Amino acid sequence: MNFIKENSQALIQRMGIVVIKQICDDLFALNVLNGEEVAIICSHRVEQDAARDIVHMILKKGSAACNLFLKSLENWNYPVYQDLTGHSLFHQNLEEDLDVLAQSLKDLYNSPVFKNFFPLGEDIDIIFNLQITFTEPVLWRKDHRHHRVEQMTLGSLLEALKSPCLIEGESGKGKSTLLQKIAMLWASGMCPALNQFKLVFFIRLSSARGGLFETLYDQLVNIPDSISKPTFRALLLKLHKKVLFLLDAYNEFHPQNCPEIEALVKENHRFKNMVIVTTTTECLRHIRHVGALTVEVGDMTEDSARVLIREVLINELAEGLLFQMQESRCLRNLMRTPLFVVITCAIQMGSEEFQAHTQTMLFQTFYDLLIQKNRRRHSGGTSGDFVRSLDYCGDLALEGVFSHKFDFELEDVCSMNEDVLVRTGLLCKYTAQRLRPTYKFFHKSFQEYTAGRRLSSLLKSREPEEVSKGNSYLKKMVSISDITSLYGNLLLYTCGSSTEATRAIMRHLAMVCEHGSLQGLSVTKRPLWRQESIQNLRNTTEQDVLKAINVNSFVECGINLFSESISKSELSQEFEAFFQGKSLYINSENIPDYLFDFFKYLPNCVSALDFVKLDFYGRATVSQDKTGENSSGVHTEGPSTYIPSRAVSLFFNWMQKFKTLEVTLRDISKLNKQDIKYLGKIFSSASNLKLYIKRCAAVAGRLSSVLRTCKNIHSLMVEASPLTTEDEQYITSVTDLQNLSIHDLHTQRLPGGLADSLGNLKNLLKLILDDIRLNEEDAKSLAEGLRNLKKMRLLHLTRLSDMGEGMDYIVKSLSEEPCDLQEMKLVDCCLTANSLKILAQNLHNLVKLSVLDMSENYLEKAGSEALQGLIGRLGVLEQLSALMLPWCWDAYISLPNLLKQLEGTPGLVKLGLKNWRLRDEEIRSFGEFLEMNPLRDLQQLDLAGHGVSSDGWLSFMDVFENLKQLVFFDFGTEEFLPDAALVRKLGQVLSKLTLLQEARLTGWELDDYDISVIKGTFKLVTA
């Protein structure tokens, strides 16, 4: 009694309201205080008043009550008890023990047992060293709405640390190594933000048992004997924020096993120690409400992934993997998750034949790790229940892929499976700031893998019901564009999971190509007119272009499926049926290893391809072949060449022949003898060779040497590449040539060159001369040569200037005798009225013409008469599908006669009346014509250079919207201010032309409001 009375002042000042209430609870349970007394004490708002009441009450109750009071005080506030009894906790010896404990922790954090860890679990004997493999993480601070608000580094996190700090992230994001790194930084003494902490404890919550003291003793170091459990407890209270707890994996923590650690997190205000705790996003909901700072671990940067790979793998393996990362966007995306970097490195360590583009292997390893690690957490069900849960997860993923769904609601996840799927890590559960939980696979690609794994198991099942279910999914894939864009990864992982599934898939894809939708791609998704110039596309229908693009991507998809399946020659027959008649594009700068496997194991499939395209670019390389290269595909020695030996190895070492090989040489400034020799080896693999040369200064004087190596060349194109007279002469000596295109050749023609000798190419079917320097004498020579080209089906003469009246001779030579010419373009080529008269007189000799393009030609003298004469003879061209006419100053007066002739060409696809200066009267006549004779197949309409008013265009709009196949139109003019009514109407009409890809309204004075009304998914050109 005397002790309490003597120390009453200190007790009243130091006990604190929390300790007072805890002592009240103890004394009430021991019948020292009754309920009324407890209520009086606890009713005080000022803690000193409460302390004063309890001290006075205890003193009145005698010695026994005083002893019980002191015992309770010792339990709940040991430092105060020690101070009052004269036994100060922090005497010199205990300070020394504290220093010993801190040093022991630092020694632990600097030891190999702490730095070395098993990134894939202790069952897999692969060890990483944290000292050299740790990379700077990307961290995001989140606000109370759970939104990212600020990117942080580890350093800025430690400087702004608040307790408790919650670090969230999905499996494999590197949360554990982050906490270990903090412990190591503290032990090093090199981090100022951590030097404030006297003690730092790293605790794995998955194995936390008993109390906090026992857990630390079990997991970390031996605590000095002089520090008892009560002493340690008091120590934590005394040191307050000088102690940091690093609590790893709250998602694997069982609070009932260690209530004291649970209180350390959720009642941190009592302990006042600093706490950092990591957890998965799904389990964050259990502690988010107590967090003072919430941080998310973001994606790993590509640079960090590269650093980790270099530290983990030996140089040769690291360089190979880094090269594959550079070439594969998908692999780079996967490497944003540290665990995938680890898995990739681990697989690389164990397999010399590992190819990182085999993504199935990565996901399969990850999937198996999740199941292996978390299966023990499944309780309350049989093994069969667990397997059924995994099947259900696969079904969920499959349905999501086909319904384009990657976020799932509660009703999507069966209640009996939800716990299993979340606990195993296959599904992530998001609850933060959501009324109802959302479920996701941690990565879209992982959902596609899970779906592919399930589809594979269905297709190879021995149960007819499951096989039927798998086939029902395949039957949903009927569009090539959907297969390559929406379902490409699903098929990739399905083929990577089993050979039997690959067989079923390839049979289905072969049928899709034969009977399915070859188009199936909306124009809005792939703006083709923006990918290539309109001039290149005007000869091709929209459907043909889409078909070509889709089939090319389909072939790439097929090769990827072959590579992923690792079936080698086992499915040769199924793959051949798929590749039959298709084309393949190869970039010589990036020839992947799997193409060598494709040529090696499926030579019959390569031979089945109708067309193979190979491009070479003007960047010198060093020798690089399949067997002698380093893992990045590049030798460190060998002569510099423009033709990579890797391409030679692929084509020349293959013993069969391509049906058609197209080789493009682009931007090459130099060709040495070795390059030409290499080209000859590549050319020899083709039964039919097409050679395209673009912007290659190197061919001047060497083209003849290149052509001498071409034994089966049937097509040659030269663009913006200088030619000598010898080169031109050699071109005309290749008598098997069927297609010849010369573009942008501005050097003066010399005697004996191309114009003089063109007639030697008697097998020529297609001739294109574009932007070539020709004078009138050259044109006369060219005309003589054209007379001998009896087999020619296509002729383009475009952008030819300074020919004087040379076109008269050319037109006469083309038309004076019956011929099989089907397409003739005479664009911007000095066409005269006399040329037009000659053509009109001889048009009966060109009855097979389907394309007649004479645009960009101004007829000066007697132009109107010549134009009307030609129009009057158009009726003999029964197969006409494209008509682009020249112009003269009064061309519009010819419109009535033209419309009368067009009544006999309902299948017209392209019509061009550029610079005809159409007026309101003519545009109304044209509209009336379209009402009576709808050109349903019209894709291109060029009425540029008109004089139509807003009223005239308004009268035309109703019939204009019926041109449903329209892809391109040009209504450009000069200084035209459209009425608001016209703009609104035009916007409505264009919204109905769903195939439209380009609209040209140059000269229309449109403001932002007008453009907002008119614009759509097509390209709008106004200037």
Swiss-Prot record:
Any single GO BP term: activation of innate immune response
CARD domain span: 1-88
PTM annotation, UniProt: Phosphorylated at Ser-533 following infection of macrophages with S.typhimurium (Salmonella). Phosphorylation is essential for NLRC4 inflammasome function to promote caspase-1 activation and pyroptosis. PRKCD phosphorylates Ser-533 in vitro.
Location in the cell reads:
Cytoplasm, Cytosol
Listed binding positions for ATP are G169, E170, S171, G172, K173, G174, K175, S176
The ranges of the LRR repeats are: 578-598, 655-678, 734-757, 761-784, 786-811, 823-846, 847-869, 877-901, 910-932, 935-962, 964-984, 998-1020
Output the InterPro entries linked to this UniProt entry. CARD, DEATH-like_dom_sf, LRR_dom_sf, NACHT_NTPase, NLRC4, Nlrc4-like_WHD, NLRC4_HD, P-loop_NTPase
Task: Write out the ranges of the annotated region (Nucleotide-binding domain (NBD)).
Answer: 95-298
Report residue spans for region: Winged-helix domain (WHD).
356-463
* Record-linked PROSITE patterns: CARD, NACHT
Phosphoserine carried by residues = S533
Cellular component aspect of the GO annotation:
cytosol; intracellular membrane-bounded organelle; IPAF inflammasome complex; plasma membrane
Pfam families per the UniProt record, alphabetical: CARD (PF00619), NACHT (PF05729), Nlrc4-like_WHD (PF22524), NLRC4_HD (PF17889)
Q: List, for all copies, the residue spans of the domain called NACHT.
A: 163-476
GO-annotated molecular function: ATP binding; caspase binding; endopeptidase activator activity; identical protein binding; protein homodimerization activity
Quaternary structure (record): Homooligomer; homooligomerizes following activation of Naip proteins by pathogenic proteins such as S.typhimurium (Salmonella) flagellin or PrgJ. Component of the NLRC4 inflammasome, at least composed of NLRC4, caspase-1 (CASP1) and some NAIP family member. Interacts with EIF2AK2/PKR.
- Domain annotation text? In an autoinhibited form the C-terminal leucine-rich repeat (LRR) domain is positioned to sterically occlude one side of the NBD domain and consequently sequester NLRC4 in a monomeric state. An ADP-mediated interaction between the NBD and the WHD also contributes to the autoinhibition.
What is its biological role?
Answer: Key component of inflammasomes that indirectly senses specific proteins from pathogenic bacteria and fungi and responds by assembling an inflammasome complex that promotes caspase-1 activation, cytokine production and macrophage pyroptosis. The NLRC4 inflammasome is activated as part of the innate immune response to a range of intracellular bacteria.
Give the protein's recorded name. Answer: NLR family CARD domain-containing protein 4
Species name:
Rattus norvegicus
